[in-house]
Amino acid sequence: MVKRKANHVIPGMNDASAQGKGAGYNEELSNEPLTEAQKQNNKKRKKNQ
């Protein structure tokens, strides 16, 4: 899987990754179950609380 780069790169600057470090994308491929503390703070579940 190719890491996608942002296409708004200014020459001379460091290339910004399209999603930033740790914004899913690589991490979401390995879905480990969340701990209880993470479930409480999960943004997808906040609307359910």
From Swiss-Prot:
Region described as Disordered: 1-49
Induction of expression: Expressed only in the forespore compartment of sporulating cells.
Membership in a protein family: Belongs to the SspO family.
Key word Cytoplasm present: no
GO CC terms: endospore-forming forespore
Keywords: Sporulation
Pfam families, alphabetized: SspO
Provenance organism: Anoxybacillus flavithermus (strain DSM 21510 / WK1)
Highest taxon of source: Bacteria
Location within or outside the cell: Spore core
Protein name per the record: Small, acid-soluble spore protein O
Gene: sspO
Biological processes annotated in GO: asexual sporulation; sporulation resulting in formation of a cellular spore
